[in-house]
């Protein structure tokens, strides 16, 4: 035991280094009597060896003893106050005893033995010591103060030396009054303020134990019992009575900075989250859920718009509609300072956000213009009422422009008004014609922004504005930005978007404003009538499909699987293949004709599958009517004359004439759903008239107008309970006339009032229209586009819960719906993350001056009396429209106007000083003429020239000499053949001169004498009269053409073609007479030494001939005056 005692003393000395050996027994003796630590525990029915624990358990128990939370259950131990039992203490020297034993796991799970159902408790965060933000720990329960502080009010039973008995009664909650609770709260706040000065716990070293000295004052202040906080904790959660453990008090030590905590944390603020994020201060922080945004800090030139500096200090948020929605507040604030794309589900207030932003830019600017554009006129009209009733923009400053207004009237509106509601087509026309000034526009609001792709008018408007104006804001509104990453990026690029605010129905900040929508998906199978029609049509089309298969133009076998898109792609692929390119014209015409017939009937197959037998029958009748008489092609008549086709028509005709016939199972289910809905709502129970008010409304979406008319026909049988009406677009189609915008607005108003309680709409009713409260949406056919699917479903559930019924056929239509749903959810996640998109923050201007930070001003907007007028703010028509103003060309900033030289484009602008200064030409100095001796070669230089430069190195001495003009006379009469470089004009003149010289014979003197005598006798009379003007023009044209000499051309033809005389003179006649007596040419090189007949003949020099020839040709040319400068001077 001696070794054990020595090791125990060493063990205790590690924690009490400041106590001497003499003072240690006294300190230990005093601590035993006054220590409030828990009593010793020993295991029941066990020996001392059973109570011994392994070192790991000892260290674990020491760690829990500091926090006051034992490790094992209370049922396994009994209180033992025997001071002499030292076997329960484990010495560090006994670690070797368990060295070879396998250590059990230190992780244990507490399982209460007396489990009872506890009610949910909502508590705030308890007082906690500072901890590093990267460490995540569990909750810490604070034990109550010692019971001695409340001895006068809470009696306890003790056994032994003042220790509470196990069956001591617990303190009641009723014993604590409000003063005690207030004192606890005050103490908690005081601990928060002193949090910076408290030392953080160390994770590497054991705590240093020091003597604890308590003063009565401290004990009285901390004597508040907080056991009521542990009322709902199970009784066996602790091993011993919790009232026996004293509270752990931290010692006051100098504060040290650890874990990289921020030094500028304000006092009195508690840490509520990780990484130094503190709670909000109510005095300077916005309400919970709202954010504070400021204009971005950018270095940009001042805007050209005139700003109202008094209004820039605040931005107004209207509270006319009641409660402020956090998401609308945050989105509107961000849309004021960034080019923003807002993606909100339908019915969540995109119009309110747009009206708020329009109001603030209307306040901030003095004369700038604000434009709201929407695809259709009904969408434009419904936005006007929102701006009048919510934002309070004066009606006198607002106008609605469409293409129906005259250009002169629109020009006046652009000059006088500031807020415009219009379609994008009208806007781009006014911008291009110069009626609208692009530099005055400060805000462009785009509704249904998912259309801003490709060459749509939205994209064209933004590009046009960007050319002339760099200081305007863009706000884009939509419910679904796109179905693919590429389409969303196209919208961002087309509108220069810098930020995206997207919300889904699962977003936390809009969940309380989204009403529940019960979606019911109903699938159907083909009816017996549909199967019969499919079989007969398959037999009709099978021969045509087989012909395409034999030509490898189409691979499908089942005619019922034909689609217009598939046939079009197959035709393109076959035409691009080798078989299609190499096929003869007849085969190509045959394949194209078969594809055209099958594509027309593929649409009929879709109508039969998904819409009903009646639309299918109407399409077949139209197909059959195209073959009457001589109309239609070979294969179209082959289909109509087929026996199966005739049998099909005979079956369909009596079915469609029956008014009670319903040609599709979806239509039968639709009728029952609509009837049940109105009967549950009590519609038409008292025989109401058709113009009475309706409490509930239904909207049915279809894909084709034929389907809409068929659904309306079936539902009209049950009037006045069901009062349906068709709602289609403006364009007219075969067998169906379109609806004008005025008619569309009238139907929407009647639907809101209850005149019609059911609308059967095509895609025109999907986008944007505020058609009132709809309680039931029926999608008669599925759309593979997630945009259209979401637009349809967004018509209901705006102000109360709504229902959606999807009618789908098994197979392709059901798969399309699942694909659209998955695609929508995936795209919403991608857009919200923003990691796969490129935003244009660099071209999103600040517009506001630097240093301006508008503060939110929530207030009620006073609506002007003029806004109460219900009519649209369209310009009034006049008897005589004003004259259209002349087109105005708006120039971008820093553009150079006027004309400029092409040479100055690359050199850049020159200053006037450079133009005025001309470089002075220096006077040339006379060159001194060298002496003759310095120019002439010396004898040595002459020899070097002869040997090195004129000797060609042959056996006999040969020297290079100048070309001889009399050598090779026969070859010099014609142009020698060339390969790359052709003969020049000088060469051709030289050849002509030599040819003329060759014509001179020895008897030329006698011949010319005879000619002169004959000419003097006739005195120059002409044999042939003057030529006609036509001949003269031909001769002049021939003279302008270049003359070419060829080997096959005779010398006489060359002579005749080069004559300059205009009349046929006797010389021509004589030359033609003596033509047969032509002699061989004579050359001087052929003369013999004995021939002295022409010794006196001296031929002219070659330079003289060339010079005179050039002077004669130049005499006929007209000189031109060339202007060296094209300037205005």
Swiss-Prot record:
GO CC annotations on file: nucleus
Pfam families: Helicase_C, ResIII
Recorded catalytic activity of this chain's protein: ATP + H2O = ADP + phosphate + H(+)
EC number: 3.6.4.12
Ranges of biased composition (kind: Basic residues): 877-889, 1028-1044
PROSITE patterns the record matches: HELICASE_ATP_BIND_1 (PS51192), HELICASE_CTER (PS51194)
Biased segments, Basic and acidic residues type: 45-63, 297-306
Domain spans labelled Helicase C-terminal: 674-843
Motif (DEAH box): 447-450
Molecular function per GO: 3'-5' DNA helicase activity; ATP binding; ATP hydrolysis activity; DNA/RNA helicase activity; flap-structured DNA binding; four-way junction DNA binding; four-way junction helicase activity
Keyword Ribonucleoprotein assigned: no
Main localization, broad class: nucleus
Keyword annotations of the record: ATP-binding, DNA damage, DNA repair, DNA-binding, Helicase, Hydrolase, Nucleotide-binding, Nucleus
Binding site for ATP: 344-351
Region (Disordered): 1-101, 124-222, 236-306, 863-930, 1018-1060, 1072-1129
GO biological process terms on file: DNA replication, Okazaki fragment processing; donor selection; double-strand break repair via synthesis-dependent strand annealing; interstrand cross-link repair; negative regulation of strand invasion
Domain Helicase ATP-binding: 331-499
Biased composition range(s): Polar residues: 203-222, 242-285, 1077-1086
Family of this protein: Belongs to the DEAD box helicase family. DEAH subfamily. FANCM sub-subfamily.
Reported function: ATP-dependent DNA helicase involved in DNA damage repair by homologous recombination and in genome maintenance. Capable of unwinding D-loops. Plays a role in limiting crossover recombinants during mitotic DNA double-strand break (DSB) repair. Component of a FANCM-MHF complex which promotes gene conversion at blocked replication forks, probably by reversal of the stalled fork.
Record protein name field: ATP-dependent DNA helicase mph1
Species assigned in the record: Aspergillus oryzae (strain ATCC 42149 / RIB 40) (Yellow koji mold)
């Amino acid at each position: 035991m001696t070794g054990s005692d020595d090791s125990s003393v060493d063990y205790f000395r590690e924690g009490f280094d400041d106590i001497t050996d003499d003072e240690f027994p006294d300190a230990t003796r005093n601590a035993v009597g006054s220590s409030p630590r828990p009593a010793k525990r020993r295991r029941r029915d066990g020996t001392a060896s059973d109570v011994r624990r392994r070192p790991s358990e000892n260290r674990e128990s020491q760690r829990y003893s500091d926090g006051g939370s034992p490790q094992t259950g209370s049922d396994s131990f009994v209180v033992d106050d025997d001071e002499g039992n030292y076997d329960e203490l484990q010495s560090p020297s006994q670690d070797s005893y368990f060295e070879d034993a396998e250590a059990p796991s230190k992780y244990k799970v507490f399982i209460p033995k007396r489990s009872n159902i506890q009610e949910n408790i909502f508590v705030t965060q308890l007082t906690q010591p500072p901890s590093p933000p990267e460490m995540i720990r569990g909750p810490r329960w604070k034990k109550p103060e010692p019971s001695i502080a409340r001895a006068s009010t809470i009696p306890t039973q003790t056994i032994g030396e003042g220790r509470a008995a196990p069956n001591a009664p617990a303190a009641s909650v009723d014993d604590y009054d409000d003063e005690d609770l207030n004192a606890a709260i005050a103490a908690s706040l005081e601990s928060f303020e002193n949090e910076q000065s408290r030392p953080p716990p160390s994770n590497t070293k054991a705590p240093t134990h020091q003597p604890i000295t308590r003063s009565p004052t401290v004990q009285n202040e901390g004597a508040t019992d907080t056991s009521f906080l542990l009322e709902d904790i199970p009784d066996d959660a602790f091993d011993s009575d919790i009232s026996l453990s004293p509270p752990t008090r931290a010692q006051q030590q100098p504060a040290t900075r650890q874990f990289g905590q921020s030094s500028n944390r304000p006092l009195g603020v508690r840490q509520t989250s990780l990484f130094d994020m503190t709670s909000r201060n109510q005095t300077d922080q916005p309400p919970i859920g709202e954010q504070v945004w400021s204009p971005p800090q950018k270095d940009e030139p001042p805007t050209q718009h005139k700003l109202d500096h008094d209004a820039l200090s605040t931005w107004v948020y209207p509270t006319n509609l009641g409660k402020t929605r956090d998401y609308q507040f945050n989105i509107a604030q961000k849309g004021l300072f960034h080019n923003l794309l807002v993606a909100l589900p339908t019915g969540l207030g995109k119009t309110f956000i747009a009206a708020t932003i329009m109001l603030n830019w209307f306040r901030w600017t003095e004369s700038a213009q604000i434009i709201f554009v929407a695809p259709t006129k009904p969408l434009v009209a419904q936005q006007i009422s929102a701006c009048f009733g919510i934002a309070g923009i004066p009606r006198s400053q607002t106008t609605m422009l469409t293409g129906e207004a005259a250009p002169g009237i629109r020009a006046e509106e652009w000059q006088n008004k500031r807020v415009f509601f219009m379609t994008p087509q009208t806007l781009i026309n006014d911008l291009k014609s110069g009626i609208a000034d692009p530099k005055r526009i400060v805000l462009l609001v785009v509704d249904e922004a998912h259309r801003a792709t490709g060459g749509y008018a939205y994209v064209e408007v933004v590009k046009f504005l960007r050319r002339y104006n760099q200081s305007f804001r863009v706000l884009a509104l939509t419910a679904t930005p796109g179905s693919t990453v590429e389409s969303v990026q196209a919208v961002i690029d087309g509108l220069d978007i810098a930020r995206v605010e997207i919300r889904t129905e699962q977003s936390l900040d809009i969940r309380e404003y989204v009403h529940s929508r019960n979606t019911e998906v109903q699938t159907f199978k083909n009816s017996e009538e549909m199967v019969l029609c499919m079989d007969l049509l398959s037999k009709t089309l099978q021969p045509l499909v087989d012909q395409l298969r034999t030509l490898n133009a189409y691979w499908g076998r089942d005619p019922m699987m034909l689609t217009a898109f598939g046939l079009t792609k197959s035709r393109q692929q076959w035409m691009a293949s080798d078989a299609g390119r190499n096929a003869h014209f007849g085969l190509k015409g045959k394949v194209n004709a078969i594809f055209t017939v099958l594509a027309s009937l593929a649409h009929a197959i879709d109508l039969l599958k998904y819409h009903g037998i009646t639309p299918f029958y109407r399409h077949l009748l139209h197909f059959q009517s195209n073959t009457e008489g001589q109309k239609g092609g070979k294969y179209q008549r082959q289909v109509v004359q087929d026996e199966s086709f005739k049998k099909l028509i005979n079956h369909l005709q009596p079915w469609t004439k029956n008014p009670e016939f319903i040609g599709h199972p979806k239509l039968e289910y639709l009728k029952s759903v609509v009837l049940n809905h109105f009967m549950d709502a009590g519609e038409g129970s008292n025989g109401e008239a058709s113009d009475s008010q309706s409490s509930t409304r239904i909207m049915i979406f279809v894909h084709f107008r034929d389907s809409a008319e068929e659904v309306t026909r079936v539902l009209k049988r049950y009037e006045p309970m069901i009062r349906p009406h068709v709602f289609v677009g403006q364009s007219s189609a075969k067998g169906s006339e379109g609806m004008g915008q005025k008619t569309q607005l009238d139907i929407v108003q009647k639907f809101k009032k209850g005149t019609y309680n059911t609308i059967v709409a095509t895609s025109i009713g999907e986008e944007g229209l505020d058609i009132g409260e709809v309680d039931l949406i029926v999608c008669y056919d599925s759309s593979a586009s997630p945009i259209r699917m979401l637009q349809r479903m967004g018509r209901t559930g705006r102000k109360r819960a709504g229902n959606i019924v999807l009618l789908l056929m098994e197979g392709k239509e059901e798969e399309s719906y699942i694909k659209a749903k998955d695609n929508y959810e995936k795209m919403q996640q991608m857009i919200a993350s923003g990691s796969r998109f490129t935003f244009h923050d660099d071209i999103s201007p600040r517009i506001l001056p630097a240093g301006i930070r508008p503060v939110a001003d929530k207030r009620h907007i006073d609506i002007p009396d003029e806004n109460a007028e219900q009519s649209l703010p369209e310009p009034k028509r006049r008897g005589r429209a004003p004259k259209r103003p002349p087109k105005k060309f708006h120039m971008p900033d820093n553009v150079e106007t006027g004309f400029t030289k092409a040479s100055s484009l690359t050199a850049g602008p020159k200053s006037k000083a450079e133009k005025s200064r001309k470089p002075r030409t220096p006077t040339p100095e006379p060159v001194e003429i060298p002496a003759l001796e310095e120019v002439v070669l010396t004898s040595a230089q002459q020899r070097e020239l002869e040997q090195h430069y004129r000797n060609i190195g042959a056996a006999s001495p040969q020297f290079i000499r100048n070309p001889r003009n009399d050598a090779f006379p026969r070859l010099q009469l014609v142009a020698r053949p060339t390969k790359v470089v052709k003969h020049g004009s000088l060469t051709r003149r030289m050849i002509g001169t030599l040819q003329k010289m060759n014509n001179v014979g020895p008897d030329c003197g006698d011949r010319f004498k005879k000619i002169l005598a004959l000419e003097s006798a006739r005195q120059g009379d002409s044999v042939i009269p003057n030529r006609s003007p036509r001949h003269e023009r031909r001769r002049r044209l021939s003279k302008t053409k270049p003359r070419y000499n060829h080997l096959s051309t005779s010398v006489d033809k060359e002579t005749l073609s080069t004559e300059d005389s205009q009349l046929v003179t006797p010389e021509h006649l004589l030359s033609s007479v003596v033509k047969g007596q032509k002699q061989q040419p004579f050359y001087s090189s052929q003369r013999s030494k004995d021939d002295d007949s022409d010794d006196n003949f001296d031929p002219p020099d070659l330079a003289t001939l060339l010079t005179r020839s050039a002077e004669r040709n130049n005499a006929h040319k007209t000189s031109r005056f060339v202007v060296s400068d094209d300037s205005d001077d």
